[in-house]
Amino acid sequence: MSSGVNSTGSAAAAPEVDKMFFCYQCNQTVTISISSSADPFCPICNQGFLEEYEDPNPNQSLNFNPNSSDSFFPMADPFSTLLPLIFGSSAAAPSGMDFMSLFGPSMQPQARSTQQNPQSDAFDPFTFLQNHLQTLRSSGTHFEFVIENHPSDPGNRMPGNFGDYFFGPGLEQLIQQLAENDPNRYGTPPASKSAIDALPTVKVTKDMLKSEMNQCAVCMDEFEDGSDVKQMPCKHVFHQDCLLPWLELHNSCPVCRFELPTDDPDYENRSQGSQGSGDGQGSVEGQQTPRFSIQLPWPFRRQDGSGSGSGAPGTGGGNLETRGEDLD
């Protein structure tokens, strides 16, 4: 029977294994060779403020050493092939593939530092992002991710798992930009006075009372037969006292988010630009959906901090290019 004592009678040294950690002092991922009995220390700053990445596949060797050719998968237009799996698209996606499969659902941090104690009910950023993005998509929001790239550097490689990069400061940046660009954060601008004045007043009919339009969607009170209501171009009707105060703050229909013209020229230009064609004047055919861009640095960081893709254009190892992937 084998034992943990060698022929000289001393205890056998525990084998060292390569494990991946996120260093909060250096703000980057590092690979450390440690034994099960040793405390990990960052090889760059020699500090112990680390969190271990849990291996989602124990049978697969993960090597995230940036000096190794096996550390990252080759860059092969990942955003056009992988990001639609996050948000959904007209193209069919493999069953079960979603946000979590791309950003790494099992790559949850496992605290190994004595300076940090995990909590069982800790905030799960990956679940939060998935739910948030799905909510935005359900309202018809279009996303465009703009990636700062170093095309002249042949060493550019995509991480095997985006969660390896977006955990830590990269994840905070992603959440911050999503929150700042959330179309529901500030809402749409007020409708123009001319558009409000042009809304017709119609009489409530018995047929209307028998339909789904038998109540005001703002106050939820049922309409009375023969009463006057305001009608939006999308045909939804509301009490005048309910609709007009809303349109003085937002140009969108409270039910379907159809948008009336505004007096904000910047907003109108953005709406017409995202449409690409059409009059953009609030017709049903020209109805706009929210659209915003998220700018992220190239998700690759060398341990010496170079090649991060976060510098200014024309500096460092080559010119930065901005490339966008529109997720319709």
From Swiss-Prot:
Biased composition (Gly residues): 306-319
Protein name: E3 ubiquitin-protein ligase RING1-like
PANTHER family on file: E3 UBIQUITIN-PROTEIN LIGASE PRAJA, E3 UBIQUITIN-PROTEIN LIGASE RING1-LIKE
Keywords: Acetylation, Metal-binding, Transferase, Ubl conjugation, Ubl conjugation pathway, Zinc, Zinc-finger
Tissue expression profile of the protein: Expressed in leaves, roots, trichomes, stipules, and also in anthers and stigma of flowers.
GO biological process: protein ubiquitination
Assigned EC number: 2.3.2.27
Catalytic activity: S-ubiquitinyl-[E2 ubiquitin-conjugating enzyme]-L-cysteine + [acceptor protein]-L-lysine = [E2 ubiquitin-conjugating enzyme]-L-cysteine + N(6)-ubiquitinyl-[acceptor protein]-L-lysine
Pathway in which this enzyme or protein is active: Protein modification; protein ubiquitination
Disordered: region residues: 264-328
Keyword Transmembrane helix: no
Post-translational modification: Auto-ubiquitinated as part of the enzymatic reaction.
Any one Gene Ontology molecular-function term assigned to this protein's record: zinc ion binding
